[in-house]
């Protein structure tokens, strides 16, 4: 019923009739949108064949109705619009799923736009109607044509031929419509009511399309200049320009409007034009043509598409009947110079250039002053031996079609002189021409693309040092490889003064001496290593040129060693860039330099806490500004870690407790992280169990309880491996800044914050949850309960279990001498409050924040800081 009722719409000459026509076409398009590619292609072919068969009568009708152009050339245009458009798109998919990646879970689907409003110019009425209706049929769009009043009969005739053939081939009735009695009001209405406008015409019409509130594919005025270089083939250039300019009496918008000839060939170019039947105007004739061409600054419509003899008569003089083109010589590029404007007829302006750069200047000035930006530019040059000129031309001209060695009217529309250039009768001019498209308009511009995106989890990895040696007394055995396996010659040791003076490096140097490996030691690492410290070490490194770097100590020594390693291998490394925050370490903007090309890196911990021996992290401080640069990249992962309990037996109680709780925090945050995996979970759980069991013994009897020391060393390294891959959370973000602003030891800072952060993270209804594909919903409470259960802590329910778990952590902290609050560590209240807002913002921006299961608001971080300070 809908299809038969739609055909009752009669002549479209009022807004009411157009409203009915719009409804008719929309109804037909809704049906057409369900067609398969096979059905569409059948219709597309049938319509193209019908249009091609009617190419001659349509050409005659267009010339008779408009009084412009040449029948024989319009036959070619009609043929082109049917044949070349069909050939270009006959095998192009425009329906349904066109791309699917099952591995990535993406699918892309072509969908029609809906109703297209097509504004048709008087210069190319039938060919443009054929072109636009065909590409709409290919894309399952409905179309309503608004013809130019001077060309309405021929335009509608072309549209009706395509429509009848399409319906006969199976298209829904009403899929193509037109305005029978065109007016500005009806044109504006269809532009407003359509889904997209295909606008071809003058600047005013294009501006109206873009101002309609409807998405528009508009084109602009052409004003192509053809530069003839001194190296050009003059005969080819001149005759191609004549061929182009006389085609349909110059009415294709890409046609040459001016010629710019180099002074060395100017006279030869002029002679060739004359030889081939062109007429050079004298000064008096040129002035008459100027006055005829432009009326009140606008192109005189009466000259468009006319023969030279006709135009000359309008101007009041005569030229030979067989004159091909009228040529006016000019020097000014100002808007007042009529020969510098678009003419759409058989008139050319001609300029003389001093050299190639001057030719570019003239061409550019004509575009800027007289219109045509974005449309077309033409070059004739020896493109083999003068390639640089072609490149300069391409760089300078602000046009979307840069036509080389080609008649631009036929070359600009595509596919005739270069088969990789899409055929079209709607030529986009890009932003330079005020357009939304910068290429020849085709079927892709009339399609919406739906993208179906299924959730996919990231590819994950587990990264660790190539070799990890552990057990008491493993150091000399591990170092054997430097000689027996790797053949190393020189080793550079990085440590701090305390460890050096207390003989911690002696076991290393003795072994190196035994193997005949030369060595030097840098022992000036400060607790918070600075860039100055690292540079001092690097100077020594460069002088010594080692092939091995051995960092021994706590986190500071290992961090300093990593930084020196970076500067040694990459002196131009920029810490600001390397410290840049990222969401995904694999997608960071900055690519970390490849490490290990100069030196093999070994990390040996002397405390059980940081895990730095197995992590890709380091922190360096700029001593001039106080800025800390946290670096994170797997290139910073040590090549070898040696975890020898002999190096940890004499660690003082304060270091033992602080580093032990630091390791516990590593395990807890790695387990709660949005990036936690089965590979990291096992390490984190085992580390927690070992810490709860052995930290008190290591704290009480550190120098004699070998078992406790060894298990704490294992726990620290396992927790390090866990957070090296799962990353950390806001406890570490806040602890980093608490330490930076108030100089609390890192382990202590973590200890003061961890249970508060656990309560914060465990909220089943957080304001915001962390963002990572693997993390599907807030479940941190359950995760903490899993940790508790692994320790044998079980409550009545999850909330009770969490409370008991937190009580156990607080008891462990108290057992190893950790105080309750930030205030208890002597941090001045006023100073704390004065720095609080800065701490909060810096903590929010810390690299660790992104992996937290609850994405924090700054106000929430502030509240936790205050609670940690006051203990309530």
Model-derived regions, located:
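Gly/Pro-rich interdomain helix-loop hinge
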Residues: 741-833, 871
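N-terminal Rossmann-like NAD(P)+-binding subdomain of aldehyde/semialdehyde dehydrogenases
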Residues: 2-107, 135, 275
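Glycine/threonine-rich beta-strand-loop-alpha-helix active-site module
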Residues: 87, 93, 158, 532-646
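Conserved C-terminal structural/oligomerization subdomain of aldehyde/semialdehyde dehydrogenase
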Residues: 3, 7, 33, 317-458
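Carboxylate- and glycine-rich phosphate/diphosphate-binding segment that chelates Mg2+/Mn2+
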Residues: 267, 275, 614-726
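ATP/NTP phosphate-donor binding region
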Residues: 459-548, 822-823
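Rossmann-like NAD(P) dinucleotide-binding subdomain of oxidoreductase/dehydrogenase enzymes
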Residues: 97-236
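ALDH superfamily catalytic-core signature
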Residues: 5, 12-14, 206-334, 361
